[in-house]
Design a protein with these regions (language model features):
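Hydrophobic packing positions in regular secondary-structure scaffolds
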Residues: 2-276
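Alpha-helical transmembrane segments and their membrane-interface boundaries
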Residues: 263, 268-405, 409-413, 417-431, ...
Length: 458
């Protein structure tokens, strides 16, 4: 693909393909540090990060070890987290310190989270005292808290300042963030009392007091709030940024919409992977790491599959006498499993977005029950017609129809009951639900189909 980026007021056309990766690989092999450095300087940081991600492990190591090659902090922060962890192993302590000193605090925290404790302390001790204090304080909070994603760099001014004082302060202060959409107004105790959009400051006369143009209805986020909860607040209230406060309600940081986009993306990816039982697996993870991560859920799935086989074993003699039962069994189980997974996916989504509540839970149960009946009847009719044409057996058609309706109803009900029950037990429903739902639909499907078959034929 061809990427066109605007960098420092000039457009850079960057052809990203296998051929270019081959060129970079060859230049690394030939120790051509000049070509590599110049090429990376011309690229957008995201494109340079893509190049590093597409290199194999040996080439990445050789790239970092090239003479005079210094990885740009803006490039490093764009690199995939699992690749970051690998690249960090090849970087010197001075290089890591240089990267951390040139990034905003929230990006620095993400990097430090991927460094083991011993090296982390060594790196922190090499940072300026102010930076070290800020990062240590953020790291003291839980991993998924607002403190871990907030920026310590923010713009806050007293309420009694004029617009002119504020503009002069913004021009002269070098410690402010490079970009900001809102200015936080604080009282004498440094507690946030309002916000003013930066655009409004530019349009207001210099003599006007900031407290006269501030918006008092601003959102304050507790420093220990779960980051997923923060994401919901940003979604619900269409926030561009929000201040973060400590237990004394004093301003300690801010969270911006780009931080939340990353959080929501990561949470969505985690939910999809957990639903499949692979956790937070990355494409760059090694074979052993991936195998270990998948083993637990595959083992659990094996035991649940054995349960379904035990149910089938109870009807072994019936199956031997009516072979058609064995032929049609997978249809009922498969339809129930798919229907259950559909309901499960919707339920996990509504749990994650707080749409499913105690007030509408009963309503959703009735809705899924109704959907199960309707889909059950529709597919019962279709299945009955197919079986009648296939085996010319009315009894067999009736058996599959009844079991289809039963299993579709069960699938709908347990597709919502299982994740909600797990959530109430403080178990992540995205991780464990799929195994239980598929097991229930398989067992009920086989039990109903073979049980009804045994009743009618014997």
């Amino acid at each position: 693909m061809t990427l066109v980026r605007k960098i420092k007021d000039k457009k850079v056309n960057f052809e990203f393909n296998k051929e270019y990766i081959k060129v970079v690989t060859d230049k690394i092999a030939n120790n051509d540090a000049v070509f590599i450095s110049n090429s990376f300087k011309e690229m957008h940081p995201a494109d340079a990060a893509d190049i590093i991600e597409h290199l194999n492990e040996n080439d990445r190591e050789n790239l970092i070890k090239l003479n005079n090659f210094k990885i740009d902090p803006e490039v490093f922060v764009e690199i995939n987290e699992s690749v970051q962890s690998e690249v960090i192993k090849y970087l010197s302590k001075d290089s890591i310190v240089y990267i951390l000193k040139n990034l905003e605090s929230d990006d620095s925290i993400k990097i430090l989270e991927n460094i083991d404790e011993k090296d982390k302390n060594d790196i922190l001790s090499s940072l300026p005292p102010k930076d070290k204090f800020i990062l240590l304080e953020s790291l003291s909070y839980p991993e998924d808290s607002a403190a871990r994603i907030m920026q310590r760099e923010f713009t806050a001014i007293p309420s009694n300042w004029s617009v002119g004082q504020t503009i002069d302060y913004l021009r002269e202060n070098k410690d402010l963030p490079e970009e900001f959409l809102e200015i936080f107004i604080v009282d004498n105790e440094f507690k946030p009392i309002g916000t003013v959009p930066s655009s409004k400051v530019l349009r207001t006369s210099r003599e006007t007091k900031m407290n006269l143009i501030m918006n008092e209805s601003q959102m304050s986020i507790p420093v220990d709030m779960d980051r997923e909860e923060v994401g919901h607040l940003f979604e619900n209230y269409n926030l561009n940024s929000a201040c973060v406060v400590d237990k004394n309600n004093k301003l300690v940081g801010m969270i911006t919409s780009d931080d939340i986009l990353t959080v929501l993306k990561e949470e969505a990816e985690e939910d999809v992977l957990r639903l499949a039982g692979v956790g937070d697996e990355e494409i760059t993870d090694g074979v052993l790491k991936k195998t270990k991560r998948r083993f637990t859920w595959l083992l659990l799935n094996l035991f649940t599959a054995i349960m379904a086989s035990v149910v089938i074993g109870f009807f072994q003699e019936d199956i031997e006498k009516v072979v058609a039962l064995a032929v049609l069994m997978p249809i009922v189980a498969s339809m129930g499993g798919n229907a259950g997974m559909q309901t499960l996916a919707v339920t996990i989504k509504t749990i994650a977005t707080k749409e499913l509540t105690k007030n509408n839970f009963s309503q959703n149960i009735i809705k899924e029950f109704s959907i199960g009946i309707l889909n059950g009847i529709i597919f019962a009719i279709i299945s009955a017609i197919v079986v009648q044409l296939w085996f010319n057996d009315t009894t067999l058609s009736l058996i599959i129809s009844i079991s289809m309706i039963l299993n579709m109803i069960v699938a709908g009900l347990f597709g919502i009951l299982v994740p909600v029950s797990l959530k109430n037990m403080n178990i992540d429903p995205a991780i464990a639900s799929s195994v239980f739902v598929t097991t229930i639909t398989d067992v009920i499907g086989f039990l109903s189909f073979l049980g009804i078959g045994a009743y009618f034929f014997y």
